[in-house]
Structures are given as structure tokens and as C-alpha cells.
From Swiss-Prot:
Species the sequence originates in: Xenopus laevis
Gene: ngf
Location(s) in or outside the cell: Secreted
Signal peptide interval: 1-18
Family indicated by similarity: Belongs to the NGF-beta family.
A Gene Ontology BP annotation from the UniProt entry: nerve development
Disulfide bridge map: C128-C193, C171-C221, C181-C223
Entry protein name: Nerve growth factor
Length: 231
């Protein structure tokens, strides 16, 4: 009888000690569950924030959209400035190509004007040697006020990308012959070839808007003379 009593007493004590352990574990599981959504929310927030840091601002001056009316208002057009969807011919026979204006300004073609440059015949030579080419990678230039300005390389007109080209001429060599310019009396004159400039109306950025502005480009190669002193 006493053995049965002790057995029942031990069983009761074991059940009493086990009950608090069960209550202690329950809040722990509940707490773990409550922290999971919070951790997930923080993770999403971190990913969202990280995405903002990685986002890059698009280049502002790349493929700027321009109102076609801006071309119809342009004055002082120069045959040395061309807007085209394709590279212009490199031959000097087409050095007077220009962008079709007014009603034809959105046509993706170019035309040639009659040349006014003298043609050298056999036995005739230039005083200075020059090279002419279309320049389509101009990003900076000096305006008529002497300030550096940003030149628009490409513009978007009616969902078509047009590139701005400049026909530039510069000296090939400051001294085509040992004495300087070709055909100059070296006994009485010092001479050398130099590139000269002119100003043309080009599309540039003014603040946050595209605007026409006079910029300086290379346009000719001339001979500079100075009289030698008497000996």
C-alpha cells in the first residue's frame, strides 16, 4: 500500500514540474512567429532602399526631344551645319550639303548646293594645304561671347534621331614647304599657314532647353605674311 502511495506521489510531482516548462516554451514559439513578419518587412525595405541607390539618372543631353517648330524659326542658316539621320558624304564635291528646311525640314534626305569655290586646274597650286571634313562628335564649343557652351550631338524629332554635323576646314600643315607658304618669296617674306574661324548657328543647350546659338568652328586655311627686316 505504501509502495502504491509513493508511486502516485512521484507521478503527481512529475506532472506539476512538467507544466511550467510547457508554458515557458509557448510564448517563445509565439514570439518567434511574431518576429518573422517584422524581419521580412525589414528585408523588403532594405531591398527597396538598395534599389533606389542603384538607380542611375539618365543622361540629360542624350537624344534630346526637340519641337520641329524650332527649326522653322531658325535664322542665319549655314551650309556648314547639317542635321541628318545618316553620315554625310565625305567627298569635297558635297561640301555644301545642307539640311532641307521649312516644309521639307523633317525629310531624312540632304541636298547639294552649287559650289562657289575655285577649281584648281593643272599646274595651279594652293598657297596652303587644307583638309575638310564633317565633324559629328562636337560636344563643346566657344560661342560668340567667348563662353564655352554645350553642343547637342543628337536630337529627337518626331521619334527620329538626327545628328548635328559641322563641315570644318583646317590647315593640313603650317608649312607646306620649308620656307612657309607655297609660292611666297622667302627672301623678302616670312610666311606660315593658319586656320581661321567663323561663327555658325548651331543647336546648343541653354539651361534645360535647346536653343540656337552662334558657335565658332574652323572654316579656312590662309597664309600669314610678315616682311623680313633689312640686313
Amino acid at each position: 500500500m505504501s509502495m502504491l502511495y509513493y508511486t502516485l506521489l512521484i507521478a503527481i510531482l512529475i506532472s506539476v514540474q512538467a507544466a511550467p516548462k510547457t508554458k515557458d516554451h509557448a510564448p517563445a514559439r509565439s514570439s518567434a512567429k511574431s518576429r518573422i513578419p517584422h524581419h521580412t518587412h525589414r528585408t523588403k525595405s532594405l531591398h527597396h532602399s538598395h534599389g533606389k541607390l542603384e538607380a542611375k539618372e539618365p543622361s540629360y543631353f542624350r537624344n534630346v526631344t526637340v519641337d520641329p517648330k524650332l527649326f522653322r524659326k531658325r535664322k542665319f542658316r549655314s551650309p556648314r551645319v547639317l542635321f541628318s539621320t545618316q553620315p554625310p558624304p565625305l567627298s569635297e564635291d558635297f561640301q555644301h550639303l545642307e539640311y532641307l528646311d521649312d516644309e521639307e525640314s523633317l525629310n531624312k534626305t540632304i541636298r547639294a548646293k552649287r559650289t562657289v569655290h575655285p577649281v584648281l586646274h593643272k599646274g595651279e597650286y594652293s598657297v596652303c594645304d587644307s583638309v575638310s571634313m564633317w565633324v559629328g562628335e562636337k560636344t563643346k564649343a566657344t560661342d560668340i561671347k567667348g563662353k564655352e557652351v554645350t553642343v547637342l550631338g543628337e536630337v529627337n524629332i518626331n521619334n527620329s534621331v538626327f545628328k548635328q554635323y559641322f563641315f570644318e576646314t583646317k590647315c593640313r600643315d603650317p608649312k607646306p614647304v620649308s620656307s612657309g607658304c607655297r609660292g611666297i618669296d622667302a627672301k623678302h617674306w616670312n610666311s606660315y599657314c593658319t586656320t581661321t574661324h567663323t561663327f555658325v548657328k548651331a543647336l546648343t543647350m541653354e539651361g534645360k532647353q535647346a536653343a540656337w546659338r552662334f558657335i565658332r568652328i574652323d572654316t579656312a586655311c590662309v597664309c600669314v605674311l610678315s616682311r623680313k627686316g633689312r640686313t
